Amino acid sequence: MPLYRNQHIDWYRHLAFACVGGFFGAYAILCRGGVMGNAQTMNLLEMIIDALYGRGFNVLAHLGAFAVYVTGTMLTVLLPSLWGVNMRRLSPVITAAAAVTECFLPADMTVIVALYPIFFAMSIQWSSFQGARSFYSSTIFSTNNTKQASLALAEYLCTKDGRQLRRMGFFLSTLLCFHIGAAIGVGASHFWGVRGALWSLPLIAWAFFMVTQEEKAEAMQAVVAE
């Protein structure tokens, strides 16, 4: 049966992008000084610390990373609204471009600046794909997915509601795929160093394919609804 006929195609697309997010999380940590380029928490904390210690250049680098992340997030609204851009298709293309760019940035480059492509790509991925199966779930970090899986288990223990088991399964599967991607990122970084970013390209290609299958499914549903 073609994938686009599978009623869980949005879930499969979600898991594919979770693998991509996990890959870049591990890659950034191993190749770029232990900093995760998927989120802003550490970046902003380091910016405050550097400001208090008077490290002007570092503060500017962190501000740049913040601006890149905010810009990527805003573009997921601006591009579709102003020009009708399909962000679900554009996002993996941008991520692939970021992966290639990372290969040309020296390993000893200023860490935060070297992460700009990942900050940009992951901010776009996060806002372009916000979950599946009616669940809100990030594909670029694990905190909320861990929280939701834990809450679902607690709810099930209290109510014996089978829906909570399905909810827990969704978030646990997201965590699993995220860390499968991270494991691939570890291997890529170990064997290829900064050029290991290229290992993400098959994952990104598969995620893009899942987007096309989901779009076919949505088109079929629209025809049936008519």
Feature-to-residue mapping (PLM):
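Alpha-helical transmembrane segments of multi-pass membrane proteins
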Residues: 1-226
